[in-house]
């Protein structure tokens, strides 16, 4: 049995293509059941996120199985396969294992190290387990992927540094203030960058948010989203002393904050430090504000430098993660390679035993002058011959199952001796790790 992967991602397809074949998370039962009804698709899991759509399956026929999965993607969503084909990738065997381990560990994500993808794969597996479309192979496979991702996050620092401008602002604020739990954030502007920064600051423990904008209604909407306070733009300097962290991103064509404005603000704060982040282009804050005592000003270039440094660090950590994944691939492939060894050996022995017994019974029934212990001796003789004949192939099969590829040997024995083998019964769903 082989693991195969067919899918597309942000690396191979535009959002226009990705959205055409996205699966609704609340409607997974139908496509999952349709997948395992396809000839030779034994198990199936569907991963569908904003950045990727992937089908994981187990099948005996690798080429046929992957072709059927591609056809299913097109047919289910009403998109010609010819349209999808240039954007699709497919993997099997070790390559499929490597791909899924890398995806789960966030090495294939748009932002390397982001944690969301692991939760999304767990959710996808949860649907497959609920509708019983995963079995012994994909159960073991995905739980191994979860443990590999956990090991990567534990043994590397791949997710420990900011790789977005908004989160870099939080990282710098923590370097200045340490604990943010008693710090108030003032947002000057109500655009997407301010909103994202507010989320990061609050997720990292900031006490509260104030929002000001030239259009007061927009400030109100954003403040309401974060249970904060909206400030009229003309009241900015009357309220600024209440903020420990100020993030500015407006469309102004001139400085809206100058050193003389901050001199009075810092006095009202009794010289308590203030942290200004100017992510506007053109800049909102006069660079000379940084000369005011106890004021720390960072602009977009400063933040980009932090991001660039952290991206380099993540790249180094990603190399460590790749090493962990290669190690884990070897261990898992040994298991999946040996999965069909025992049933094949059992079937081979059973085949030989059936022949031995049939021929022995014919001989015994035709032998009229058989000595009293003749039947017993012939039984032992024929059993010994069968054991001698079967010892080399079964020993070789066991040996390859412990440390190498077995598909060649298993397939050869099945073909040569017309063996019918079955995998163990699916073990059902496994409890998801936290």
UniProtKB/Swiss-Prot annotation:
GO molecular-function terms, A-Z: glutamyl-tRNA reductase activity; NADP binding
Residue numbers marked as site, Important for activity: 99
EC number assigned by the record: 1.2.1.70
InterPro entries assigned to the protein according to its UniProt record, in alphabetical order: 4pyrrol_synth_GluRdtase, 4pyrrol_synth_GluRdtase_dimer, 4pyrrol_synth_GluRdtase_N, GluRdtase_CS, GluRdtase_dimer_dom_sf, GluRdtase_N_sf, NAD(P)-bd_dom_sf, Shikm_DH/Glu-tRNA_Rdtase
Binding site residues for substrate: 49-52, 109, 114-116, 120
One annotated GO biological process: protoporphyrinogen IX biosynthetic process from glutamate
HAMAP family named in the record: Glu_tRNA_reductase
Domain notes: Possesses an unusual extended V-shaped dimeric structure with each monomer consisting of three distinct domains arranged along a curved 'spinal' alpha-helix. The N-terminal catalytic domain specifically recognizes the glutamate moiety of the substrate. The second domain is the NADPH-binding domain, and the third C-terminal domain is responsible for dimerization.
Name of the protein: Glutamyl-tRNA reductase
Organism: Geobacter sulfurreducens (strain ATCC 51573 / DSM 12127 / PCA)
Taxon lineage: Bacteria, Pseudomonadati, Thermodesulfobacteriota, Desulfuromonadia, Geobacterales
Gene of this entry: hemA
